[in-house]
């Protein structure tokens, strides 16, 4: 399924324009964590610094966040995964997103993805990987998120004004326990706190490389549920199956 972007004239315009230097930033995180609001403030900071950002918003069924970004005067495209995993959809559309960003003569492509699975970390190796997480999800949330957080370069913590200082400190320690190498930014999607710091990291992020690879392997292979099987219980399913006690088996040819 191709990305559905804003009208851009000739479909072939700009293709193969790989000579232009371009940075890629992938922003993922838990639903409702404030990814879009934080990113909008970061876009404003990048614009003030003279950079030309472009945004691709990946969502599941519906979004109007593209209208919010359009008000900032930046190129924006939308991709709806629909019946597919939004992170998988984002991963295999990276080439189209980069082509589109070059057509827009952007300096940096900001890819905001839905990040619903948590186990599917959509970060290529040649990007700045940003995980946005909501502190109100509880002190142990960073330990539950998985590769979405553990392979991120930057973890942006939102809604810190809704909890105590002690809770924020515990949350921070849990993040570092899961990912000791990451940078942590405390952000506020309403006031814009932390946006300038995030924009500075984006400016210093890596340029897009050739033959990019994912930082972490995806979950186990496709099962019959992925291909549309509706019946419950293992007797109706094939592929790699995991039991409640952790035992794994392969069922099928």
Can you annotate each of these PLM segments?
Residues 57, 79, 112, 130-135, ...:
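Conserved beta-strand segments of the P-loop GTPase G domain that flank and frequently precede/overlap
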Residues 60-63, 115-116, 136-139, 160-164, ...:
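Conserved nucleotide-binding/hydrolysis micro-motifs of P-loop NTPases
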Residues 1-28:
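Extreme N-terminal, non-catalytic leader segments
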Residues 118-123, 140-143, 164-168:
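Conserved ATPase-coupling elements of RecA-like P-loop NTPase cores
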Residues 22-33, 37-124:
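Nucleotide-state-sensitive switch-loop elements of NTP-binding domains
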Residues 119-136, 147-151:
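Inter-motif core of Ras-like GTPase G domains
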Residues 162-214:
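Canonical P-loop GTPase G-domain recognition
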Residues 23, 27-32, 44-47, 210-253:
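P-loop NTP-binding site
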